[in-house]
Structure formats: C-alpha cells, structure tokens
Amino acid sequence: MKKAFNKFLDFSNSWTGTVVIVLLIIFFVAQAFVIPSGSMKHTLLVGDHLFVKKFSYGVPTPRIPWLEIKVLPDFRGNGHLINGEGPKRGDIVVFRYPHNEKIHYVKRNFAVGGDEVIFSEKQMFLRPHEGDEFIKANYPSEKIVNFAGKNFVKEPYDFPGIQYDEKINLFEQALYYLNAGKFAMQPVIVDNLAKIKDLAFNAFYFKVPDEEYFMVGDNRDHSNDSRFWGSVAYKDIVGKPWFIYFSLDDDYKIRWNRVGRLIDTVQNEPKYAQRARDERHDDGDKIE
C-alpha cells in the first residue's frame, strides 16, 4: 500500500501527473469561469471569477476546456456520463448556449419542464406544473394571481439582486426580435394585465418542454436569455456556481468583499447587491 502511494506521489509530482490531475478535476469536479457580461447583475458581477461544481446535476460528458471537444462519446445521449437531478427552480446554473455549445452562459433557472411562463412589461409570472394547490401551499398569497382560471406566481424569486431597469423598455425590444423571428415566446392577451397601446397583445407566453429549463438573467432588462432563444435541455447543463475565488471591478480594483464568498451567500444577503449597486456602471441599452 505504501509503495503504491509513493508511486502515486511521484506521478503527481511529474508534469504529466500534474496535467492529468488538473484535467480530471476540470472534467469531473470543478471548473473556473469568468462573468463576462452584466446579465446577472447585481447578483454576479462582470469580473467575478467563479468555480463551478461540475457534479451538481450529474456528471457531464468531459470536454477539453476552451476547445469544448468531447473526450468521451455521449453514451447516454443527454450530455452526461452519470445522470443526476436537474436544476431546481431558482438555481443559478452554468450551461452551454443551445445554439453554440462552445459558449457558456450563467443565468437563473426560472422554470422547469411543464411549467408555464408569462412575460409582460417589467414583470414575469410562473405557473409551476404541479398546479393550483401546490402554488397555494408554497407561495405567499400576495404573489398569486389568476389568469384565465389558472393561478400564476408574480415574480416568484425574492433574491435581492433581481432588478428591472426603468430606463429600458425590453418589451419594445422583444417586439423587434419577434418580428425578426428571433423571440421564443408567443404573444398573448392576458385580460388581467394592462393593455399596451396599438398592440393586439399585452404579454408573451412560453410552456417549458419536459426535461428542459427556462433560464433568465437577474438583470432582467439586460439579459439575452430563454425569452429570446428558448429553453435549455439537460444535455447542455454544465453545473452550479460554487464560490467566487477572485473579482475585479471596472477599474481593475480587487473586490475584496466578494473574494472567497459562496454564491449562496452572495445571492441571499442584501448587502452584496447593495454594494454592487453602489459601483459605477453604465449598461446603456445592451442585452447580454
């Protein structure tokens, strides 16, 4: 036993051993990512460097970092060597962009398979597939609204970093993308919502296919997400952000208050969202 252990130590101390161990960690345990855009502001910030747990939702089929070349075949056909439970509602998730698997996104899982989503001006609604009794038992009554005889939950997640930008009318931009055939949600009229001038509809609707996930950025009006390009299949799920190991602001100063913080801490404690709001930012009208 001691002899085998010594051989392992010798191997791990070699260049080959170091590379193999690092790749195994990246393939199966954790991988580093950098937040490149403001779509999750004020929860995750541009310049946050994260470690992502690769085993949060099963074990993904390993790929060479940056090149995204598969090391092994996709034996199960669902992008995972070992299946696991998929993302829960409200989870922050790292996944591959469905239209380009070399691009990674990080968003919040707004809805799971079978759920219904309504998006209108400055508000979003969720109908969990479990139905009315589940909604009444799991959400505060003041958030529950009824559309066409079905209960929905208005803004079901209370994380302090979730925000809308009063300077931006994303609904108008959604119309542009809809007319260009680049918007995934369907226009609908919802009687209980305010009418929008000159339009035959006042909201957008989407029902999430089974075993897929509807991903939305916390920075609602600056997020290119499932509202535009549809839901995310389980095969594209990479993992769950774990903790911030480094963070730089726009002036290349280290955000010491974020370094070493677990994502669960950052997303749940209001002081982190407030400090993020206190930073100087200029989103303009970008959708990222």
Q: Language model features by range: what are they?
A:
Residues D10-A30:
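Hydrophobic membrane-insertion alpha-helices, especially the h-region
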Residues Q31-D48:
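Alpha-helical transmembrane signal-anchor/signal-peptide segments
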Residues K2-L9, F28, L45-E288:
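Soluble "head" domains of membrane/secretory-pathway proteins
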